[in-house]
UniProtKB/Swiss-Prot annotation:
SUPFAM superfamilies per UniProt: Nucleotide-diphospho-sugar transferases
Protein name as annotated: N-acetylglucosaminyltransferase
Record's bilayer topology term: Peripheral membrane protein
NCBIfam families: nodulat_NodC
Domain of life: Bacteria
Keyword annotations from UniProtKB, A to Z: Cell membrane, Glycosyltransferase, Membrane, Nodulation, Plasmid, Transferase
Gene from which the chain derives: nodC
Cell location: Cell membrane
Main EC class the enzyme belongs to: transferase
GO cellular component terms listed in the entry, alphabetical order: plasma membrane
Reported function: Involved in the synthesis of Nod factor, a sulfated N-acyl-beta-1,4-tetrasaccharide of N-acetylglucosamine which initiates a series of events in the host plant species leading eventually to nodulation.
Length: 424
């Protein structure tokens, strides 16, 4: 047996053992009830909080934006609700103007128009104009069920909770084989990974398309959130994970509400999907380092979660790489590696199909091939290019002052404001 074959067998065997422990614990905790640190009677007697919804948009499809705002207008919420739409220097600004006209008589809606693209973190600075107890961030390509605000706000009535997210689905699931695969990927990410983390009040990333934050907590973290640097350069993506980790660092709980359903548009071509995954991989690697000091204060499961995701990825990559080397040099297939990966894929897909009560999850086996031959090399590239903050889907954004700071002026208007920046 060659050194390559031995290494491949050892790596995949360690990967199998680690993944078995990690995934078993994940499924076990995902099925259990979240522990609340506040007595239920105290939560129920808290007043219904006011909610401000912030919708940052950039070059959004007019139909998609219209559907997003319509879903917000139809929210069934007993408390006060305001909606702030922030156009981040879109080239198709007519789409936003049309929506402004459509909701001109709805006092809940406020439209802010930025003259140039400044990035999502700066667009979310509309929080400084708002006054709600809670802030709900909704991406402009996302529609939410009528009860989402109510369900997330109910979870946030526990003062120990700083952030909460809903369950993500693909609104364009039926378009291509890739969108179907991504929809299943979202289900697993929400109902296994996030659900298990929420068991201990420590969801590590509240997904941006539908995430609610406590305004008082967010204001105290806003400067850190807006000015995140990596190796001396502004970090312009991964804002969801970064803000969540800041919440955990400040001592707040972060939660997952599976019954709060949000549907978002997902990539329907492989090129767009891989560019998205590259951005996410870079931000995940960056913020994993930021999260390390937080882990000792959380339940031990969260340490296992970090090890399972990162060390597991390294072991799988090593086994695949040495297996390919074995085949290239000796013309013999790494049968043990293939058998272990195939068996683990079958078990995982079967468990998902059983838990979701949907046979389509058996087809998620295709994701294993995508992961091995596309995502692992992409993540290796991301690890080697962590300093690159290019969005890949658009040009670099300008860094501008926060709304309301010196250098920003607000034009008169009841439901519309236009912010002009003096700096680059």
């Amino acid at each position: 047996m060659t050194l390559l074959a031995t290494t491949s067998i050892a790596a995949i065997s360690l990967y199998a053992m680690l993944s078995t422990v990690y995934k078993s614990a994940q499924v076990f905790h995902a099925r259990r009830t979240t522990i609340s640190t506040t007595p239920a009677k105290d939560i129920e007697t808290n007043p219904v909080p006011s909610v401000d919804v912030i919708v940052p948009c950039f070059n959004e499809d007019p139909i998609v934006l219209s559907e997003c705002l319509a879903s917000l207008a139809e929210q069934d919420y007993a408390g006060k609700l305001r909606i702030y739409v922030v156009d981040d220097g879109s080239k198709n600004r007519d789409a936003v103007v049309a929506q402004r006209a459509a909701y001109a008589d709805d006092e809940r809606f406020n439209f802010t128009i930025l003259p140039k693209n400044v990035g999502k973190r700066k667009a979310i600075a509309a929080i400084t104009q708002s006054s709600g107890d809670l802030i709900l961030n909704v991406d402009s390509d996302t529609t939410i069920a009528p009860d989402v605000v109510s369900k997330l706000a109910h979870k946030m009535r526990d003062p120990a909770v700083g952030a909460a997210m809903g369950q993500m689905k693909a609104s364009n699931q039926a378009d291509t084989w890739l969108t179907r695969l991504i929809d299943m990927e979202y289900w697993l990410a929400c109902n296994e990974e996030r659900a298990a983390q929420a068991r201990f009040g420590a969801v590590m990333c509240c997904c941006g398309p539908c995430a609610m934050y406590r305004r008082s907590a967010m204001l105290s973290l806003l400067d850190q959130y807006e000015t995140q640097l990596y190796r001396g350069k502004p970090s312009d993506f991964g804002e969801d994970r970064h803000l969540t980790i800041l919440m955990l660092s400040a001592g707040f709980r972060t939660e997952y509400v599976p019954s709060a359903i949000a549907a978002t548009v997902v990539p329907d071509t492989m090129g767009v999907y891989l560019r998205q995954q590259l951005r996410w991989a870079r931000s995940t690697f960056r913020d994993t380092l930021l999260a390390l000091p937080v882990l000792p204060g959380l339940d031990r499961y969260l340490t296992l979660d970090a090890i399972g995701q990162n060390v597991g990825l390294l072991l799988l990559a090593l086994s695949v790489l040495t297996g390919i080397g074995q085949f290239a040099l000796t013309a013999t297939l790494p049968w043990w590696t293939i058998l272990v990966i195939g068996s683990m894929t079958l078990v995982r897909c079967s468990v998902a199909a059983y838990r979701a009560r949907e046979l389509r999850f058996l087809g998620f086996a295709l994701h294993t091939l995508v992961n091995i031959f596309l995502l692992i090399p992409l993540k290796a590239y991301a690890l080697c290019t962590l300093s690159n903050s290019d969005w890949l889907s658009r040009g670099s954004v300008a860094i501008a002052p926060t709304v309301g700071q010196q250098g920003a002026t607000k034009m008169p208007g009841r439901a519309t404001s236009e912010i002009a920046y003096s700096g680059e």
